[in-house]
Structure formats: structure tokens, C-alpha cells
């Protein structure tokens, strides 16, 4: 699976918001992740439309989680920002499509078991098969 910049920064911002527990300005989040404010705010807008983030403009404004961190999974974020976890195919070997599809599905199943609350709490995420 190739982790896109949108996914990495979006998930990072959500984890920061979960840990903060209060509104955080977009420029503060962007500075923390070393990315432009405009780029991160575009990602946050997608997360807002999906119902994960709320925002308010002004001196006492910022972004915050619109739902409890325990109700948002990494799979939710992947689907919102990237559509789905798809293993990037580097070759065109015949007969491997089902292998790549199985790996992609296993990735999404694992991501469904991880919540923002778990990640923001600093828990060591270990998956078992």
C-alpha cells in the first residue's frame, strides 16, 4: 500500500485533534506537520464534509473532532481521503490480481480495528493474524 501525503497529513491532523481535546488553528496543525496551511486545510475540509471534523473561524476558532475519537477508525480516514487501501502494483504478472485484492482487503480490515483514540493515546498498535 502506498500511503499518500493526503492520508498521512490528514491522519496526523486527526490524531493531533484527538490528543488536544480543544480547537486547534489550521496554521498550528500545518506547522506541526511541516506542510502548507492551504494544503492541510483542503484535507481538513474533506474531513469536515465527512463529519469527522468541525470548525469555527475567528480568534477562538479552529478545528476539533466532531465525533468521539473512539468512533473514528483509520479505515474511515483511508476511505474518506483515498477511497480505499489499494496495494500498489509494481508488476503486471498474470494471476496475481486476487493476491493484491486480498492484501488490500486485509489492510482495510486491520485499519478498521484501529481507532483515533488508540493512536492518540500512544498505544502500541500490533495486529495479530
Question: Where are the model-predicted features located?
Answer:
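Alpha-helical residues within the helix-turn-helix
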Residues: 31, 48-49
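Core alpha-helical elements of the protein kinase catalytic domain
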Residues: 15, 45-46
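N-terminal helix-turn-helix DNA-binding core of bacterial DNA-binding proteins
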Residues: 3-36, 64
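Conserved segment of winged-helix/HTH DNA-binding domains
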Residues: 69-94
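C-terminal regulatory/oligomerization modules of transcriptional regulators
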Residues: 90-129
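Residue cluster at the C-terminal edge of the helix-turn-helix DNA-binding motif
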Residues: 49-52, 80
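Beta-hairpin "wing" of winged helix-turn-helix
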Residues: 51-66
Amino acid at each position: 500500500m502506498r500511503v499518500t501525503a493526503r492520508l498521512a497529513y490528514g491522519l496526523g491532523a486527526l490524531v493531533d485533534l484527538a490528543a488536544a481535546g480543544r480547537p486547534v488553528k489550521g496554521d498550528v496543525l500545518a506547522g506541526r506537520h511541516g506542510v502548507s496551511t492551504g494544503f492541510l486545510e483542503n484535507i481538513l475540509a474533506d474531513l469536515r464534509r465527512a463529519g469527522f471534523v468541525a470548525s469555527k473561524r475567528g480568534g477562538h476558532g479552529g478545528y476539533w473532532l466532531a465525533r468521539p475519537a473512539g468512533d473514528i477508525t483509520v479505515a474511515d480516514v483511508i476511505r474518506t481521503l483515498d477511497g480505499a487501501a489499494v496495494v500498489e502494483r509494481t508488476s503486471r504478472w498474470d494471476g496475481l490480481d486476487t493476491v493484491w485484492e486480498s492484501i488490500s482487503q486485509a489492510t482495510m480490515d486491520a485499519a478498521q480495528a484501529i481507532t483515533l483514540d488508540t493512536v492518540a493515546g500512544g498505544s502500541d498498535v500490533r495486529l495479530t493474524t
